[in-house]
Regions:
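Conserved N-terminal segment of class I S-adenosyl-L-methionine
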Residues: 1-99, 112-119, 123, 145-186
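Conserved beta-strand signature within the Rossmann-like core of class I S-adenosyl-L-methionine
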Residues: 125-135
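A short acidic, helix-capping loop that chelates divalent metal ions and anchors anionic groups
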Residues: 137-142
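Conserved short hydrophobic patches within well-ordered secondary structure
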Residues: 79-81, 106, 128-129
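Flexible loop residues that form catalytic
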Residues: 36, 105, 133
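A short SAM/SAH-binding and catalytic strip from SAM-dependent methyltransferases
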Residues: 101-111
Length: 186
């Protein structure tokens, strides 16, 4: 059912695209891809803006994974080179990636699993673009029939201080809730 597919906040879109255009990756893994926003936008700004319009001329490998079986649509099959229905906590990468995009994912697991997942991504990727709700007010159960949408951990910007952050943006929603974007080197 399309109503239970995960999505990401609006606050991350421009920042993530700026980071991707700066890195110029040849491979991307979209963690918790949901509707496919990052795959779609990466194709637009890394391929189409480089005048590679035909799918057979694309040079950037973009793979996706999502735990929710309701995620997959024909859009995913077109945009992504491969798409896996798997929980990132049990996923074993088959290759290194230049960039992992992991926005609005870590809060859906307990803090220990979130930190392990981040460690895994940093071990397998040169860059991790992380978006995560910060502070109080984000707690919620799953919704629209999707138990994977429950927020199970509260994150703070200080949780990420030990990592090699090259860029970050802290912002707030229209409701005053905190949100952080972090470009972390693997």
């Amino acid at each position: 059912m399309a109503g239970d597919i995960g999505t990401s906040t609006l606050y991350s879109t421009e920042w993530v695209i700026e980071q991707l255009r700066e890195v110029k990756p040849s491979s991307i893994i979209d963690i918790g891809c949901g509707w496919g926003r990052w795959g779609f936008l990466a194709r637009e700004f890394l391929e189409l803006w480089s005048h590679r319009f035909a799918r057979d001329s694309w040079k950037v490998r973009i793979d996706a994974l999502d735990v929710n079986p309701s995620t997959w649509t024909p859009v995913h099959a077109y945009i992504y080179d491969s798409a896996l229905q798997v929980d990132v906590r049990t996923w074993v990468p088959s290759q290194r990636y230049d960039v992992a995009i992991c926005c609005d994912v870590l809060e859906h697991m307990d803090k220990e699993d979130g930190l392990k997942t981040l460690g895994k991504l940093l071990a397998w990727c040169d860059h991790v673009l992380l978006g995560v709700p910060l502070g109080a007010g984000w707690e919620r159960p799953g919704f629209d029939g999707n138990p994977y949408e429950a927020h199970l951990a509260r994150w703070e910007a200080s949780d990420l201080e030990p990592y090699n952050i090259t860029a970050h943006k802290l912002t707030q929603t229209e409701d005053g809730l905190g949100y952080g974007l972090f470009h972390i080197l693997g």
